[in-house]
Amino acid sequence: MFEHLPPFLNEVVNNSISVDDRDTILIGAIVCLSVCFHNVCGVYDERIVYPNLYLFVVADAGMGKGALTLCRELVAPINRNLHELSKRMEQEYKEAMSAYIKGKKTDEMTMPTEPPMRMLVIPANSSASSFLKILGDNDGIGLLFESEGDTLSQTLKSDYGNYSDVLRKAFHHELVSLSRRKDREYCEVANPRVSVALAGTPEQVRRLIPDAENGLMSRFCFYIIRFKRGIRNVFATSDISQSKNAMFKLLGDKFCHLHEEFVRQGIILFSPLICRNSLLNISVV
């Protein structure tokens, strides 16, 4: 399989140091990048589906699940660009609001609209209302990425942050909504496209999904790193420019440029197989 990877993913997995590391990085990269392909869709079971996936990398302490954290760097430039866009829009909003307050007594001015909070990576410890608000501000697109599964499980157990039902619905791109009577708040996201990447120990999985009856169980892909004895050289390089962090930051910049070109192509639709041994028929709408 690995010899048939697209060039970019091939570059990504070439930075691995072991078989488990390679597998973790590949599946982690696929999940993180899936949230960026919101213009790609297909039909499965007569319903429109998108590439989004939920992943939980499971391993005991010190077994290498930390490799997943490198995959976040692949989408970090896109997330950073969205944050910078939000800051600019917020500054423009404040200036427009200041002008509105000063001139509303004499001129017929329209009150400025508060800008959306643009981001790609959503903090897992967000409240339920904040999570839905951020999704709404970003056209239903978002990535939950946490290197410790407890961050999400503790949030879902709280009164303010229980959005487990939202995650279950978002997996199938169903409409999600929230209403708060106290603040007369209503938020609705019609077509959520959410990806989730988590890492943790088996116990952290049990805290997030206490039993098989929990709907989250069937939504997640679980990659389990088995216990192995051995020691590897953690001082293989002392050159910061050759560190995995630096390598993945460069790959993130590269993907950011690839992504800009990709989204310009419009909606990409995968149609059904025309015969058993044929390739997928791909069309650009």
Can you say where each PLM-predicted feature lies in the sequence?
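Phosphate-handling catalytic cores of nucleic-acid transaction enzymes
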Residues: 1-285
